[in-house]
């Protein structure tokens, strides 16, 4: 069977038959919704601009719908799956549907949040239908741990997509927006209808594209130091930064001094700041004197 034949991919009947054979029911606990439409997974691969020399990491492959479409386009695919049954079944599905590409597939049976290394060449792309309940932490963790990932396309709940791609001043701009922007240029890349999933979710889905920054943000502060400011600023997002950062700085006057030194108004709110401005604040964290 050629990997370019339409029946190499999984359709609705294939998905349901495979699930029945395995005794699998998608669980809300793990945020699982399986994609049952071959056109949709091919669209995701096209939108992700997967190249023939790419090593793609996929998180939460499920029954393998997107995995097979990625194998059509990429050099290698590494799938990370936490579910015991799904992890055991996926290599056999790849072997059965795309035997000539099976040697280009690797499975890591693990929680993606615990993965610190992947087999084979360093990944160049992340393409995934992320489980909705862990989408943001998984995305940020993968971008942190695998700096070789240049391009990312993830399918997430629509409101999460909005948050990730939001710009300063937008009402949904927040912690995910800033942290994602630390690593990459982020934008919405389309919408996905509910009817391409089984079971059909109660929410809409969206695609988010992240292209890693060619140059890291120019700052002497570490990622952890910058993210600490971001977390503090949005923990009390309705407060001014002078008040919201008082715990981080040690006091409100100390927060004001750090803000002024960074060129930021103490009366501003976190939702107005760019990631570069958060980095500037982190550089001016007051020294805590030990008595």
UniProtKB/Swiss-Prot annotation:
GO cellular component, one term: cytosol
Cross-referenced PROSITE patterns: RRNA_A_DIMETH, SAM_RNA_A_N6_MT
Intracellular or extracellular location(s): Cytoplasm
Record keywords, A-Z: Cytoplasm, Methyltransferase, RNA-binding, rRNA processing, S-adenosyl-L-methionine, Transferase
SMART domains, A to Z: rADc
Binding-site residues, S-adenosyl-L-methionine: 33, 35, 60, 81, 111, 129
Pfam families found in the cross-reference section: RrnaAD (PF00398)
InterPro entries: KsgA/Erm, rRNA_Ade_diMease-like_C, rRNA_Ade_Mease_Trfase_CS, rRNA_Ade_methylase_Trfase_N, rRNA_adenine_dimethylase, SAM-dependent_MTases_sf
Catalytic reactions on record: adenosine(1518)/adenosine(1519) in 16S rRNA + 4 S-adenosyl-L-methionine = N(6)-dimethyladenosine(1518)/N(6)-dimethyladenosine(1519) in 16S rRNA + 4 S-adenosyl-L-homocysteine + 4 H(+)
Keyword Cytoplasm: yes
Function: Specifically dimethylates two adjacent adenosines (A1518 and A1519) in the loop of a conserved hairpin near the 3'-end of 16S rRNA in the 30S particle. May play a critical role in biogenesis of 30S subunits.
NCBIfam families, per the entry: ksgA (TIGR00755)
Protein name, entry field: Ribosomal RNA small subunit methyltransferase A
